[in-house]
């Protein structure tokens, strides 16, 4: 399970250190792709495979399903860690998440997310303000 919040920076070549706690769970290869809310999603191969099965089951006759799958897969990249525990993020992914220097990597149960520090600060400030309301709304989902 991925949890915690870690600050790192992207270098000029697009390399980003993955936290040691996450590296242990990721294995040799994993996938990073565009995420929602302006961040990137990272999945261990087992989670990525399970997600692929769900995405393949979406109806191709639905325009929104086609658009989502196309957008999600088109930027997906298999990553391998170098000897320093870094991955190389393609420019398209860095652009999607506005990653220029300071990043925040957060654990979100079965995946991790990569945020620009600025976007993460904005998101977490808003989430903290709305936390009670969000929690109350989740009661509808059995929480």
Swiss-Prot record:
Family note: Belongs to the MraZ family.
Cited InterPro entries: MraZ, MraZ_C, MraZ_dom, MraZ_N, MraZ_sf, SpoVT-AbrB_dom, SpoVT-AbrB_sf
Predominant localisation class: cytoplasm
Domain SpoVT-AbrB intervals: 5-47, 76-119
Source taxon at top rank: Bacteria
Gene designation: mraZ
UniProt cross-references to Gene3D superfamilies, sorted A to Z: Transcriptional regulator MraZ domain
Compartments it resides in: Cytoplasm, Nucleoid
GO molecular function ontology, one term from the record: DNA-binding transcription factor activity
GO cellular component terms, semicolon-separated: cytoplasm; nucleoid
Description of how the protein assembles with itself and partners: Forms oligomers.
Gene Ontology biological process: negative regulation of DNA-templated transcription initiation
Protein name: Transcriptional regulator MraZ
Keywords of the record: Cytoplasm, DNA-binding, Repeat, Transcription, Transcription regulation
């Amino acid at each position: 399970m991925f949890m915690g919040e870690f600050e790192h920076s992207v270098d000029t070549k697009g390399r980003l250190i993955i936290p040691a706690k996450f590296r242990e769970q990721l294995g040799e290869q994993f996938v990073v792709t565009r995420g929602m809310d302006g961040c990137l999603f990272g999945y261990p191969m087992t989670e990525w495979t399970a997600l692929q099965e769900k995405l393949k089951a979406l109806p191709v006759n639905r325009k929104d399903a086609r658009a989502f799958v196309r957008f999600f897969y088109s930027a997906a990249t298999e990553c391998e860690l170098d000897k320093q525990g870094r991955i190389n993020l393609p420019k398209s992914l860095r652009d999607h998440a506005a990653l220029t220097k300071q990043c925040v990597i957060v654990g979100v149960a079965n995946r991790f997310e990569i945020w620009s520090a600025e976007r993460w600060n904005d998101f977490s400030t808003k989430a903290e303000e709305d936390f009670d309301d969000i929690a109350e709304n989740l009661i509808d989902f059995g929480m």
